[in-house]
Amino acid sequence: MTLTASSSSRAVTNSPVVVALDYHNRDAAMAFIDKIDPRDCRLKVGKEMFTLFGPQFVRELQQRGFDIFLDLKFHDIPNTAAHAVAAAADLGVWMVNVHASGGARMMAAAREALVPFGKDAPLLIAVTVLTSMEASDLADLGVTLSPADYAERLAALTQKCGLDGVVCSAQEAVRFKQVFGQEFKLVTPGIRPQGSDAGDQRRIMTPEQALSAGVDYMVIGRPVTQSVDPAQTLKAINASLQRSA
């Protein structure tokens, strides 16, 4: 285990907002990042950007003060998933995720891989049902449960394996907080401020509604990244959340 030089320089934010960086152009991504403040949000780096630009891109974001959610959704045999999660922790990310459908042994191995990192370990979150999926999509896979019921089953398995929480839809958050408790973190994509286009997300909610539902961290993409004034958009979202708290 190595310590990242950037870990001590990152700003602390109390905002639940995580901005999804969905860029295929590095310069465009950095131009956006230069406009926002790490005190107003965290950043999510997904498969496309990580594949294009690698760990060094994450380090650059950390050096600018941002906490990083490394959204790679590891899903592999237990040993491979565990090594991947440990590599993410070594990079100094704030949060990393795996697919709950990888099963109990995989999730337990991932959790154990973070033990040596102690308090510096990232939050380990499991993906339940992707927010783009509907009942018909699950039926195609032979799953007869509704998206909500299947997500709850996977969330229960995630908690049993000792992970920190799950990625879920905002509609599932109320039920999940009741069933799994306040300490079980809920991370929700598909959050759109009032008036935003739904895009490719099927199960969406506004930031205020998500907060009220019990969401701990809300992932917001294009409404911020495509804003004419992203810094002001973030401040407006955070202000609305403070009023709703």
From Swiss-Prot:
One of its GO terms (biological process) is 'de novo' UMP biosynthetic process. Pathway: Pyrimidine metabolism; UMP biosynthesis via de novo pathway; UMP from orotate: step 2/2. Keywords: Decarboxylase, Lyase, Pyrimidine biosynthesis. GO terms for cellular component: cytosol. Transmembrane segments: none annotated. InterPro entries: Aldolase_TIM (IPR013785), OMPdecase (IPR014732), OMPdecase_AS (IPR018089), OMPdecase_bac (IPR047596), OMPdeCOase_dom (IPR001754), RibuloseP-bd_barrel (IPR011060). The active site is at residue 73. Substrate binds at residues 22, 44, 71-80, 131, 192, 201, 221-222. NCBIfam families: PRK00230.1, pyrF. Homodimer. Belongs to the OMP decarboxylase family. Type 1 subfamily. This is Orotidine 5'-phosphate decarboxylase. It comes from Escherichia coli O127:H6 (strain E2348/69 / EPEC).
